[in-house]
Protein backbone atom coordinates (compact mmCIF):
# COMPACT_ATOMS: atom_id res chain seq x y z
CA UNK A 1 0.00 0.00 0.00
CA UNK A 2 1.32 3.44 -0.96
CA UNK A 3 1.56 5.69 2.08
CA UNK A 4 1.43 9.46 1.80
CA UNK A 5 2.28 11.81 4.65
CA UNK A 6 1.71 15.56 4.53
CA UNK A 7 3.60 17.81 6.96
CA UNK A 8 1.38 20.81 7.69
CA UNK A 9 -2.38 20.75 8.32
CA UNK A 10 -3.25 24.20 7.01
CA UNK A 11 -5.27 25.69 4.14
CA UNK A 12 -3.30 23.71 1.54
CA UNK A 13 -2.33 20.46 3.25
CA UNK A 14 -5.71 19.59 4.76
CA UNK A 15 -7.98 19.99 1.71
CA UNK A 16 -5.41 18.58 -0.76
CA UNK A 17 -4.84 15.42 1.25
CA UNK A 18 -8.57 14.99 1.89
CA UNK A 19 -9.25 14.97 -1.86
CA UNK A 20 -6.33 12.59 -2.57
CA UNK A 21 -7.75 10.24 0.08
CA UNK A 22 -11.24 10.48 -1.44
CA UNK A 23 -10.05 9.82 -4.99
CA UNK A 24 -7.44 7.17 -4.09
CA UNK A 25 -9.08 4.79 -1.57
CA UNK A 26 -6.14 2.35 -1.86
CA UNK A 27 -3.66 4.97 -0.61
CA UNK A 28 -3.24 5.72 3.10
CA UNK A 29 -3.00 9.46 3.67
CA UNK A 30 -1.86 10.96 6.98
CA UNK A 31 -1.73 14.70 7.68
CA UNK A 32 0.66 15.57 10.50
CA UNK A 33 1.23 18.79 12.39
CA UNK A 34 2.99 19.75 15.62
CA UNK A 35 -0.07 21.81 16.65
CA UNK A 36 -2.28 19.59 18.81
CA UNK A 37 -5.26 22.03 18.77
CA UNK A 38 -5.15 22.06 14.96
CA UNK A 39 -5.04 18.27 14.67
CA UNK A 40 -7.78 17.94 17.31
CA UNK A 41 -9.93 20.27 15.19
CA UNK A 42 -9.33 18.17 12.06
CA UNK A 43 -10.48 15.13 14.05
CA UNK A 44 -13.60 16.92 15.34
CA UNK A 45 -16.94 18.00 13.90
CA UNK A 46 -15.68 21.61 13.67
CA UNK A 47 -12.83 21.67 11.13
CA UNK A 48 -10.16 24.37 11.65
CA UNK A 49 -10.80 25.98 8.26
CA UNK A 50 -13.97 26.91 6.41
CA UNK A 51 -14.09 25.76 2.80
CA UNK A 52 -17.29 24.83 0.91
CA UNK A 53 -17.50 21.05 0.42
CA UNK A 54 -14.55 20.24 2.70
CA UNK A 55 -16.65 18.85 5.57
CA UNK A 56 -18.26 16.22 3.36
CA UNK A 57 -14.95 15.06 1.87
CA UNK A 58 -13.22 14.80 5.26
CA UNK A 59 -16.13 12.98 6.91
CA UNK A 60 -16.29 10.42 4.11
CA UNK A 61 -12.59 9.51 4.34
CA UNK A 62 -11.56 10.21 7.94
CA UNK A 63 -10.80 7.00 9.79
CA UNK A 64 -10.87 4.99 6.54
CA UNK A 65 -7.76 6.05 4.64
CA UNK A 66 -7.42 9.65 5.87
CA UNK A 67 -5.88 10.34 9.27
CA UNK A 68 -4.74 13.42 11.21
CA UNK A 69 -1.96 13.03 13.77
CA UNK A 70 0.61 14.86 15.89
CA UNK A 71 2.96 11.85 15.71
CA UNK A 72 4.97 13.51 12.98
CA UNK A 73 8.12 11.38 13.06
CA UNK A 74 6.30 8.01 13.01
CA UNK A 75 4.25 8.82 9.92
CA UNK A 76 7.13 10.52 8.09
CA UNK A 77 9.26 7.42 8.66
CA UNK A 78 6.52 5.13 7.29
CA UNK A 79 5.60 7.19 4.20
CA UNK A 80 6.71 6.61 0.60
CA UNK A 81 5.73 10.11 -0.51
CA UNK A 82 6.03 13.12 1.82
CA UNK A 83 4.31 16.39 0.97
CA UNK A 84 5.72 19.43 2.76
CA UNK A 85 3.02 22.04 3.17
CA UNK A 86 4.40 24.29 5.89
CA UNK A 87 4.12 28.05 6.12
CA UNK A 88 6.66 30.11 4.14
CA UNK A 89 5.95 33.66 5.36
CA UNK A 90 7.86 36.75 4.30
CA UNK A 91 10.96 37.33 6.46
CA UNK A 92 10.49 40.09 9.01
CA UNK A 93 14.16 40.53 9.95
CA UNK A 94 17.66 39.88 8.64
CA UNK A 95 18.81 39.50 5.03
CA UNK A 96 15.90 39.99 2.64
CA UNK A 97 13.53 41.19 5.38
CA UNK A 98 10.22 42.30 3.95
CA UNK A 99 10.69 40.47 0.65
CA UNK A 100 12.40 37.07 0.91
CA UNK A 101 10.51 33.95 1.95
CA UNK A 102 11.31 32.66 5.43
CA UNK A 103 12.22 28.99 4.94
CA UNK A 104 12.77 28.21 8.64
CA UNK A 105 9.84 25.76 8.80
CA UNK A 106 10.84 24.16 5.51
CA UNK A 107 14.41 23.60 6.63
CA UNK A 108 13.39 22.11 9.98
CA UNK A 109 10.97 19.77 8.14
CA UNK A 110 13.78 18.65 5.80
CA UNK A 111 16.15 18.00 8.69
CA UNK A 112 13.48 16.03 10.52
CA UNK A 113 12.82 13.91 7.40
CA UNK A 114 16.55 13.16 7.16
CA UNK A 115 16.70 12.25 10.87
CA UNK A 116 13.81 9.78 10.94
CA UNK A 117 13.82 8.19 7.47
CA UNK A 118 14.80 4.54 7.17
CA UNK A 119 13.77 4.01 3.53
CA UNK A 120 13.89 5.92 0.22
CA UNK A 121 11.52 8.90 0.03
CA UNK A 122 9.93 11.15 -2.54
CA UNK A 123 9.73 14.62 -0.95
CA UNK A 124 7.22 16.97 -2.57
CA UNK A 125 7.29 20.77 -2.23
CA UNK A 126 3.67 21.82 -1.82
CA UNK A 127 4.26 25.19 -0.15
CA UNK A 128 5.03 28.13 -2.42
CA UNK A 129 8.81 28.46 -2.30
CA UNK A 130 11.51 30.56 -3.99
CA UNK A 131 13.22 29.21 -7.11
CA UNK A 132 16.10 26.87 -6.20
CA UNK A 133 14.59 25.89 -2.83
CA UNK A 134 14.55 22.27 -4.02
CA UNK A 135 18.31 22.45 -4.48
CA UNK A 136 18.80 23.64 -0.90
CA UNK A 137 16.47 20.95 0.47
CA UNK A 138 18.24 18.35 -1.65
CA UNK A 139 21.57 19.34 -0.11
CA UNK A 140 20.21 19.04 3.45
CA UNK A 141 18.75 15.60 2.72
CA UNK A 142 21.73 14.19 0.81
CA UNK A 143 24.27 15.47 3.35
CA UNK A 144 22.32 13.66 6.08
CA UNK A 145 21.17 10.72 3.96
CA UNK A 146 22.77 7.72 5.72
CA UNK A 147 22.56 5.88 2.39
CA UNK A 148 18.88 6.70 1.82
CA UNK A 149 17.87 8.06 -1.60
CA UNK A 150 15.68 11.16 -1.75
CA UNK A 151 13.98 12.59 -4.81
CA UNK A 152 12.69 16.15 -4.54
CA UNK A 153 9.65 17.17 -6.59
CA UNK A 154 7.92 20.53 -6.92
CA UNK A 155 4.12 20.23 -7.05
CA UNK A 156 2.80 23.75 -6.40
CA UNK A 157 -0.84 24.26 -5.46
CA UNK A 158 -3.08 26.46 -7.57
CA UNK A 159 -6.05 26.59 -5.23
CA UNK A 160 -8.28 29.57 -4.69
CA UNK A 161 -9.70 29.80 -1.18
CA UNK A 162 -13.46 29.51 -1.27
CA UNK A 163 -13.32 27.14 -4.26
CA UNK A 164 -10.46 24.87 -3.12
CA UNK A 165 -12.42 21.60 -3.24
CA UNK A 166 -13.81 22.40 -6.68
CA UNK A 167 -10.29 23.36 -7.83
CA UNK A 168 -8.92 20.06 -6.52
CA UNK A 169 -11.69 18.00 -8.14
CA UNK A 170 -11.30 19.72 -11.54
CA UNK A 171 -7.89 21.40 -11.72
CA UNK A 172 -6.88 23.51 -14.73
CA UNK A 173 -3.54 21.76 -14.46
CA UNK A 174 -1.41 19.73 -12.08
CA UNK A 175 2.23 20.76 -12.30
CA UNK A 176 5.01 18.35 -11.31
CA UNK A 177 8.65 19.42 -11.52
CA UNK A 178 11.49 16.97 -11.02
CA UNK A 179 15.11 16.21 -11.83
CA UNK A 180 15.77 15.10 -15.40
CA UNK A 181 17.58 11.97 -14.23
CA UNK A 182 16.26 8.38 -14.38
CA UNK A 183 15.52 8.53 -10.62
CA UNK A 184 13.90 11.94 -10.98
CA UNK A 185 11.68 10.77 -13.84
CA UNK A 186 10.65 7.70 -11.84
CA UNK A 187 9.63 9.92 -8.90
CA UNK A 188 7.63 12.21 -11.22
CA UNK A 189 5.85 9.15 -12.62
CA UNK A 190 4.99 7.92 -9.10
CA UNK A 191 3.30 11.23 -8.25
CA UNK A 192 1.63 11.36 -11.68
CA UNK A 193 0.03 7.99 -10.93
CA UNK A 194 -1.55 9.41 -7.76
CA UNK A 195 -3.18 12.32 -9.61
CA UNK A 196 -4.11 10.14 -12.60
CA UNK A 197 -6.84 8.56 -10.44
CA UNK A 198 -9.02 11.57 -11.30
CA UNK A 199 -7.08 14.15 -13.35
CA UNK A 200 -6.99 13.71 -17.17
CA UNK A 201 -3.47 13.01 -18.42
CA UNK A 202 -3.37 16.12 -20.62
CA UNK A 203 -3.81 18.27 -17.51
CA UNK A 204 -0.78 16.82 -15.73
CA UNK A 205 2.22 18.91 -16.81
CA UNK A 206 5.78 17.84 -16.07
CA UNK A 207 8.72 20.27 -16.08
CA UNK A 208 12.13 20.64 -14.52
CA UNK A 209 12.25 21.65 -10.86
CA UNK A 210 13.06 25.30 -11.40
CA UNK A 211 10.29 25.85 -13.96
CA UNK A 212 7.71 24.39 -11.57
CA UNK A 213 8.89 26.58 -8.69
CA UNK A 214 8.89 29.75 -10.80
CA UNK A 215 5.55 28.92 -12.47
CA UNK A 216 3.74 29.23 -9.14
CA UNK A 217 5.25 32.63 -8.32
CA UNK A 218 4.62 33.85 -11.87
CA UNK A 219 0.99 32.66 -11.87
CA UNK A 220 0.20 34.56 -8.66
CA UNK A 221 2.07 37.63 -9.88
CA UNK A 222 0.08 37.64 -13.14
CA UNK A 223 -3.25 37.30 -11.30
CA UNK A 224 -2.40 40.09 -8.85
CA UNK A 225 -1.21 42.22 -11.77
CA UNK A 226 -4.64 41.92 -13.42
CA UNK A 227 -6.35 43.09 -10.21
CA UNK A 228 -3.98 46.05 -9.87
CA UNK A 229 -4.47 46.86 -13.56
CA UNK A 230 -8.25 47.07 -13.28
CA UNK A 231 -7.98 48.94 -9.97
CA UNK A 232 -5.67 51.51 -11.58
CA UNK A 233 -8.27 51.94 -14.34
CA UNK A 234 -11.01 52.28 -11.68
CA UNK A 235 -9.34 55.45 -10.35
CA UNK A 236 -9.31 56.88 -13.87
CA UNK A 237 -12.96 55.88 -14.36
CA UNK A 238 -13.98 57.88 -11.29
CA UNK A 239 -12.03 60.89 -12.53
CA UNK A 240 -13.60 60.80 -16.01
CA UNK A 241 -17.12 59.46 -15.45
CA UNK A 242 -16.44 56.11 -17.12
CA UNK A 243 -17.85 52.92 -15.56
CA UNK A 244 -15.18 50.35 -14.65
CA UNK A 245 -17.67 47.46 -14.99
CA UNK A 246 -18.36 48.44 -18.59
CA UNK A 247 -14.67 48.96 -19.34
CA UNK A 248 -13.71 45.61 -17.77
CA UNK A 249 -16.51 43.81 -19.64
CA UNK A 250 -15.37 45.30 -22.96
CA UNK A 251 -11.72 44.50 -22.30
CA UNK A 252 -12.54 40.98 -21.08
CA UNK A 253 -14.39 40.21 -24.32
CA UNK A 254 -11.01 40.22 -26.08
CA UNK A 255 -10.19 36.49 -26.30
CA UNK A 256 -6.52 37.27 -25.68
CA UNK A 257 -7.39 38.79 -22.31
CA UNK A 258 -10.55 37.06 -21.05
CA UNK A 259 -12.94 38.16 -18.29
CA UNK A 260 -11.45 36.66 -15.12
CA UNK A 261 -9.83 38.75 -12.37
CA UNK A 262 -11.12 42.01 -13.84
CA UNK A 263 -13.40 43.02 -10.96
CA UNK A 264 -12.40 46.37 -9.49
CA UNK A 265 -12.29 46.32 -5.71
CA UNK A 266 -10.77 47.82 -2.59
CA UNK A 267 -7.70 45.63 -3.26
CA UNK A 268 -6.42 42.06 -3.21
CA UNK A 269 -5.49 40.11 -0.10
CA UNK A 270 -4.83 36.53 0.93
CA UNK A 271 -1.75 34.63 1.95
CA UNK A 272 -0.20 34.36 -1.52
CA UNK A 273 -0.34 37.36 -3.81
CA UNK A 274 1.66 39.94 -1.88
CA UNK A 275 4.01 37.37 -0.36
CA UNK A 276 4.78 35.76 -3.71
CA UNK A 277 5.28 39.06 -5.55
CA UNK A 278 7.68 40.27 -2.84
CA UNK A 279 9.48 36.95 -3.17
CA UNK A 280 9.69 37.46 -6.94
CA UNK A 281 10.99 41.01 -6.36
CA UNK A 282 13.70 39.69 -4.05
CA UNK A 283 14.76 36.97 -6.51
CA UNK A 284 14.99 39.58 -9.28
CA UNK A 285 17.10 41.87 -7.07
CA UNK A 286 19.39 38.99 -6.11
CA UNK A 287 19.88 38.16 -9.79
CA UNK A 288 20.78 41.73 -10.74
CA UNK A 289 17.46 42.59 -12.39
CA UNK A 290 16.35 45.85 -10.68
CA UNK A 291 14.10 46.93 -13.58
CA UNK A 292 12.18 43.66 -13.40
CA UNK A 293 11.98 43.94 -9.60
CA UNK A 294 10.57 47.47 -9.84
CA UNK A 295 7.98 46.37 -12.40
CA UNK A 296 6.53 43.78 -10.01
CA UNK A 297 6.81 46.11 -6.99
CA UNK A 298 4.40 48.44 -8.75
CA UNK A 299 1.64 45.79 -8.57
CA UNK A 300 1.76 45.99 -4.77
CA UNK A 301 2.09 49.78 -4.75
CA UNK A 302 -1.14 50.10 -6.77
CA UNK A 303 -2.83 47.71 -4.33
CA UNK A 304 -1.74 49.86 -1.38
CA UNK A 305 -2.82 53.00 -3.25
CA UNK A 306 -6.28 51.52 -3.85
CA UNK A 307 -6.79 50.84 -0.14
CA UNK A 308 -5.63 54.30 0.92
CA UNK A 309 -7.76 55.86 -1.84
CA UNK A 310 -10.80 54.05 -0.43
CA UNK A 311 -10.12 55.34 3.10
CA UNK A 312 -9.63 58.87 1.79
CA UNK A 313 -12.90 58.64 -0.11
CA UNK A 314 -14.73 57.61 3.09
CA UNK A 315 -13.21 60.41 5.18
CA UNK A 316 -13.54 63.17 2.57
CA UNK A 317 -17.17 62.24 1.81
CA UNK A 318 -18.15 62.48 5.47
CA UNK A 319 -17.25 66.15 5.89
CA UNK A 320 -13.53 65.37 6.02
CA UNK A 321 -13.63 63.59 9.36
CA UNK A 322 -14.86 60.32 10.81
CA UNK A 323 -13.72 61.16 14.33
CA UNK A 324 -16.25 59.79 16.81
CA UNK A 325 -18.50 58.52 14.00
CA UNK A 326 -19.69 54.94 13.89
CA UNK A 327 -18.60 53.16 10.71
CA UNK A 328 -20.00 49.68 10.03
CA UNK A 329 -17.56 47.32 8.32
CA UNK A 330 -19.32 44.46 6.54
CA UNK A 331 -16.83 41.71 5.79
CA UNK A 332 -13.34 41.18 7.16
CA UNK A 333 -12.11 38.04 5.33
CA UNK A 334 -10.02 38.76 2.24
CA UNK A 335 -12.71 37.22 0.01
CA UNK A 336 -16.07 35.47 0.34
CA UNK A 337 -16.48 31.80 1.28
CA UNK A 338 -13.41 31.72 3.51
CA UNK A 339 -12.55 32.75 7.05
CA UNK A 340 -8.98 33.65 6.04
CA UNK A 341 -7.93 37.19 6.95
CA UNK A 342 -4.29 37.10 5.86
CA UNK A 343 -3.39 40.38 4.11
CA UNK A 344 -7.09 41.27 3.90
CA UNK A 345 -7.69 44.85 2.68
CA UNK A 346 -10.04 45.25 5.66
CA UNK A 347 -7.04 45.52 7.99
CA UNK A 348 -5.59 48.54 6.19
CA UNK A 349 -9.00 50.17 5.75
CA UNK A 350 -9.77 49.76 9.46
CA UNK A 351 -6.33 51.09 10.42
CA UNK A 352 -6.94 54.13 8.21
CA UNK A 353 -10.34 54.81 9.78
CA UNK A 354 -9.03 54.20 13.30
CA UNK A 355 -6.24 56.68 12.54
CA UNK A 356 -8.96 59.31 12.12
CA UNK A 357 -10.57 58.14 15.40
CA UNK A 358 -13.63 56.41 13.92
CA UNK A 359 -15.71 54.01 16.00
CA UNK A 360 -15.82 50.76 14.02
CA UNK A 361 -18.41 47.98 14.23
CA UNK A 362 -17.39 44.86 12.27
CA UNK A 363 -19.48 41.93 11.06
CA UNK A 364 -18.17 38.93 9.10
CA UNK A 365 -20.03 35.61 9.01
CA UNK A 366 -16.86 33.49 9.22
CA UNK A 367 -14.22 35.49 11.12
CA UNK A 368 -14.04 35.40 14.92
CA UNK A 369 -13.69 38.45 17.15
CA UNK A 370 -10.41 37.07 18.46
CA UNK A 371 -8.99 36.87 14.92
CA UNK A 372 -10.14 40.39 14.04
CA UNK A 373 -8.64 41.89 17.21
CA UNK A 374 -5.36 40.03 16.60
CA UNK A 375 -5.17 41.28 13.02
CA UNK A 376 -5.86 44.88 14.00
CA UNK A 377 -3.24 44.75 16.77
CA UNK A 378 -0.50 44.04 14.23
CA UNK A 379 1.18 47.00 12.57
CA UNK A 380 1.60 47.03 8.80
CA UNK A 381 4.94 45.77 7.55
CA UNK A 382 6.76 48.37 5.49
CA UNK A 383 8.71 46.24 3.04
CA UNK A 384 10.75 49.22 1.79
CA UNK A 385 11.91 50.01 5.35
CA UNK A 386 11.98 46.62 7.11
CA UNK A 387 11.62 46.39 10.84
CA UNK A 388 10.25 43.66 13.05
CA UNK A 389 6.48 43.57 13.38
CA UNK A 390 5.32 45.32 16.53
CA UNK A 391 1.79 45.46 17.95
CA UNK A 392 0.13 48.84 17.52
CA UNK A 393 -1.10 50.86 20.45
CA UNK A 394 -3.80 48.94 22.34
CA UNK A 395 -5.96 52.09 22.40
CA UNK A 396 -7.28 51.04 18.96
CA UNK A 397 -9.25 48.21 20.58
CA UNK A 398 -11.56 50.60 22.42
CA UNK A 399 -12.79 51.92 19.07
CA UNK A 400 -13.61 48.47 17.64
CA UNK A 401 -16.60 46.24 18.33
CA UNK A 402 -17.27 42.91 16.61
CA UNK A 403 -20.89 41.82 16.23
CA UNK A 404 -22.62 38.79 14.73
CA UNK A 405 -25.32 40.50 12.71
CA UNK A 406 -25.19 43.02 9.84
CA UNK A 407 -28.16 44.96 11.22
CA UNK A 408 -26.51 45.29 14.63
CA UNK A 409 -23.28 46.49 12.97
CA UNK A 410 -25.10 49.19 10.98
CA UNK A 411 -27.46 50.39 13.73
CA UNK A 412 -26.74 54.06 14.44
CA UNK A 413 -23.86 54.13 11.95
CA UNK A 414 -22.96 57.15 9.85
CA UNK A 415 -21.48 55.01 7.08
CA UNK A 416 -21.22 51.40 5.88
CA UNK A 417 -18.07 49.97 4.25
CA UNK A 418 -18.55 46.69 2.35
CA UNK A 419 -15.12 45.05 2.29
CA UNK A 420 -15.90 41.38 1.49
CA UNK A 421 -18.25 40.22 -1.28
CA UNK A 422 -20.30 37.82 0.88
CA UNK A 423 -23.51 36.89 -0.99
CA UNK A 424 -25.65 37.81 2.02
CA UNK A 425 -24.64 41.48 1.66
CA UNK A 426 -26.46 41.60 -1.70
CA UNK A 427 -29.79 40.62 -0.12
CA UNK A 428 -29.81 42.65 3.11
CA UNK A 429 -32.86 44.80 3.85
CA UNK A 430 -31.20 48.12 3.06
CA UNK A 431 -34.39 50.06 3.80
CA UNK A 432 -34.24 48.71 7.36
CA UNK A 433 -30.53 49.58 7.55
CA UNK A 434 -31.19 53.11 6.24
CA UNK A 435 -33.98 53.70 8.75
CA UNK A 436 -31.64 52.86 11.64
CA UNK A 437 -28.63 54.92 10.49
CA UNK A 438 -27.57 58.51 11.10
CA UNK A 439 -28.34 60.86 8.20
CA UNK A 440 -26.96 61.48 5.68
CA UNK A 441 -26.35 57.72 5.40
CA UNK A 442 -23.35 56.60 3.35
CA UNK A 443 -22.53 53.25 1.71
CA UNK A 444 -18.97 52.71 0.48
CA UNK A 445 -19.04 49.56 -1.62
CA UNK A 446 -15.50 48.20 -1.82
CA UNK A 447 -16.60 45.13 -3.78
CA UNK A 448 -19.28 46.52 -6.09
CA UNK A 449 -21.88 44.07 -4.76
CA UNK A 450 -24.89 46.34 -4.18
CA UNK A 451 -27.26 47.94 -6.68
CA UNK A 452 -26.18 51.56 -6.22
CA UNK A 453 -29.26 53.04 -7.92
CA UNK A 454 -31.68 51.13 -5.68
CA UNK A 455 -29.78 52.32 -2.61
CA UNK A 456 -29.86 55.91 -3.86
CA UNK A 457 -33.64 55.63 -4.26
CA UNK A 458 -33.83 54.62 -0.59
CA UNK A 459 -31.82 57.73 0.31
CA UNK A 460 -28.23 56.51 0.66
CA UNK A 461 -25.22 58.39 -0.66
CA UNK A 462 -23.36 55.58 -2.45
CA UNK A 463 -19.75 55.20 -3.51
CA UNK A 464 -18.97 52.22 -5.78
CA UNK A 465 -15.39 51.70 -6.90
CA UNK A 466 -14.79 52.84 -10.47
CA UNK A 467 -18.43 53.80 -11.08
CA UNK A 468 -19.79 57.27 -11.96
CA UNK A 469 -19.80 59.29 -8.76
CA UNK A 470 -22.85 60.28 -6.77
CA UNK A 471 -23.46 64.03 -7.20
CA UNK A 472 -22.54 64.45 -3.51
CA UNK A 473 -19.10 62.93 -4.08
CA UNK A 474 -18.09 64.67 -7.31
CA UNK A 475 -16.60 67.67 -5.57
CA UNK A 476 -14.77 65.58 -2.96
CA UNK A 477 -11.06 64.82 -3.48
CA UNK A 478 -10.38 61.12 -4.18
CA UNK A 479 -6.92 61.23 -2.65
CA UNK A 480 -5.81 63.45 0.21
Swiss-Prot record:
Enzyme Commission number(s) of this protein: 1.1.1.22
Class of enzymatic activity (EC top level): oxidoreductase
GO cellular component, one term: nucleus
One biological process term in Gene Ontology: UDP-glucuronate biosynthetic process
Phosphoserine modification, residue list: 393
Role description: Involved in the biosynthesis of UDP-glucuronic acid (UDP-GlcA), providing nucleotide sugars for cell-wall polymers.
Protein's UniProt name: UDP-glucose 6-dehydrogenase 4
Organism whose genome encodes this protein: Oryza sativa subsp. japonica
Encoding gene per record: UGD4
